Structure formats: structure tokens, C-alpha cells
A protein has these predicted regions:
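N-terminal active-site segment of His-dependent metallophosphoesterases
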Residues: 1-68
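A general structural motif
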Residues: 10, 50-51, 76-78, 128-129
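A generic local structural motif
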Residues: 40-43, 65-70, 103-105, 117-121
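A short, conserved beta-to-alpha structural element at the edge of catalytic cores
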Residues: 34-50, 77-95
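Short secondary-structure boundary/capping segments
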Residues: 5-6, 46, 71-72, 106-108, ...
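Metal-dependent catalytic neighborhoods of phosphoester/phosphodiester hydrolases
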Residues: 27, 58-75, 83, 88-103, ...
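Active-site neighborhood of phospho(di)ester-bond hydrolases with catalytic His/Asp-centered motifs
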Residues: 16-17, 54-59, 79-85, 118-119, ...
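Conserved beta-sheet core of the metallophosphoesterase superfamily
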Residues: 95-138
Length: 138
């Protein structure tokens, strides 16, 4: 990660959004099985190795700091979190738990000159040539 809000994205980078861990009412908004949190954690850890990068496009978890600490302690990978509307943690708290918090968006230019902008909410309008990958819309 560099100071200009860039990150090297490769084919080994995992991208996910809107896990909403500890969101008690998420079932009202989108259909999830009863044990959805356990399934996400299991699938995450089955796929992601401890040294791989996970770029989370926001709304990682709700609730208190101990919930966040628990999740970062059991989920594999190096977490880069673009702050979503439900992510209310400070930069220093995230750093203390080995999570890189990205406040607004992440700009990435690939070797083939493709320009990507990762964000929680959709960015409209985009500058010419940029592709927006975002979460938020379920």
C-alpha cells in the first residue's frame, strides 16, 4: 500500500463486500440462511490463505470493537477495508488489529492500463476510462 491510496491488485487478490457481520436485521433486507455468519467465516477461511490480500469494499461488521477483534483474529488474509456506511472504526484501531482502513476509494491501474476504482458506494459519474467496482447495493 502506498501513500497515494493505491494497492497492487493481482489475480490472487480476494474482493468481497457487505458481509455485515453481527447485523441482526440483515435477514429482513436480503435472504440469508440462519447460520450465515458461520458459513461466511468457513468459506472465507477455506478459500483465503493467511498471507493473501482481501480487499473488502465496506460494511464489514456492525457492533462493538470486540466483535471486530474476534473477526480479525479468526479470518485468514491481510484485510484492506474500504470504509462503508456501517464501518465506524478509527484508523488507529484498525491498524492495531492489522487492518488497513481506506477512507473513501482505492485507485488501481493495472499493467494493461485498465483503471479501476474500488469504493463502497457507486461513484457516478466516473472519469473516462475508469471502471468502478463497488458494494453497498444488495
Amino acid at each position: 500500500m502506498t501513500s497515494d491510496n493505491t494497492l497492487e491488485i493481482t489475480l490472487d487478490t480476494w474482493i468481497i463486500s457487505d458481509t455485515h457481520f453481527f447485523h441482526e436485521n440483515i435477514g429482513r433486507y436480503c435472504s440469508r440462511p440462519e447460520n450465515w455468519q458461520e458459513l461466511i467465516i468457513k468459506n472465507w477461511n477455506d478459500l483465503v490463505s493467511p498471507d493473501e490480500i482481501v480487499l473488502h469494499l465496506g460494511d464489514f461488521a456492525l457492533g462493538n470493537k470486540s466483535n471486530f477483534e474476534m473477526l480479525t483474529g479468526i479470518l485468514n488474509g491481510r484485510l484492506f477495508l474500504i470504509q462503508g456506511n456501517h464501518d465506524r472504526l478509527s484508523q488507529s484501531f484498525c491498524v492495531a488489529h492489522s487492518v488497513t482502513l481506506i477512507k473513501n476509494s482505492l485507485l488501481v491501474e493495472l499493467e494493461n492500463h485498465m483503471k479501476l476504482i474500488f469504493s463502497h458506494r457507486p461513484i457516478i459519474p466516473l472519469e473516462d476510462g475508469w471502471i468502478n467496482l463497488h458494494g453497498h447495493i444488495h
